[in-house]
Amino acid sequence: MAVIQDIIAALWQHDFAALADPHIVSVVYFVMFATLFLENGLLPASFLPGDSLLILAGALIAQGVMDFLPTIAILTAAASLGCWLSYIQGRWLGNTKTVKGWLAQLPAKYHQRATCMFDRHGLLALLAGRFLAFVRTLLPTMAGISGLPNRRFQFFNWLSGLLWVSVVTSFGYALSMIPFVKRHEDQVMTFLMILPIALLTAGLLGTLFVVIKKKYCNA
């Protein structure tokens, strides 16, 4: 718990030297890994802020806190392993009450979008779906339910994971290198730190609202 407090304090104070400490940066990697794994792997956790976290990772790379290639490798593994977990849920637990309940709690627009993409493009939908919140968690579950072979799924899973992590993280890095952004570095880093928290809160409240609304309507 003390390490988490140190990380938050270092981010808030923009103390990148402290964040670059091997012990602290390993915890940062762990938190990012866990967040991406859960967001990609569990439907109830699909509200977690994966995109904004990758942008923050790119900004931290630009500040010398983390290295580019290890970050891409670690976060790609997190996203792809999480996506595999989502596929397994659909393949082996798709007909269970629990998974059906999770699917029912997702906003209808995301379910319709994922269904349309999967029906039209099959596994190729994973490449574009990775860049859409909620959809990237839902598509692997649908692939598992449809009975698609694991070998075919894994190819598109890891390819789309690498593409998503590389593009969004590189965007965060490039954004941090823009002269205007560099001149307002403190404000930008504060924004990038607050953004995932704000999105997490909004996603959690939105999910709770949908759950309560559906329970009220079914009562």
UniProtKB/Swiss-Prot annotation:
InterPro entries: DedA-like, VTT_dom. The chain crosses the membrane at residues 18-38, 68-88, 161-181, 192-212. It is found in: Cell inner membrane. GO terms for molecular function: transmembrane transporter activity. Changing E39A: Abolishes the ability to restore growth, cell division or drug resistance in double mutant. One of its GO terms (biological process) is FtsZ-dependent cytokinesis. GO terms for cellular component: plasma membrane. Residues 39-67, 182-191 are periplasmic. Residues 1-17, 89-160, 213-219 are cytoplasmic. Disruption phenotype: Double mutants lacking both yghB and yqjA show incomplete cell division, temperature sensitivity and altered phospholipid levels. They are also hypersensitive to several compounds known to be exported by other drug efflux proteins, including ethidium bromide, methyl viologen, acriflavine and beta-lactam antibiotics. Expression of either yghB or yqjA can restore the wild-type phenotype, suggesting that these proteins have redundant functions. Both individual null mutant strains grow normally at all temperatures. Keywords: Cell inner membrane, Cell membrane, Membrane, Transmembrane, Transmembrane helix. Belongs to the DedA family. This is Inner membrane protein YghB. It comes from Escherichia coli (strain K12).
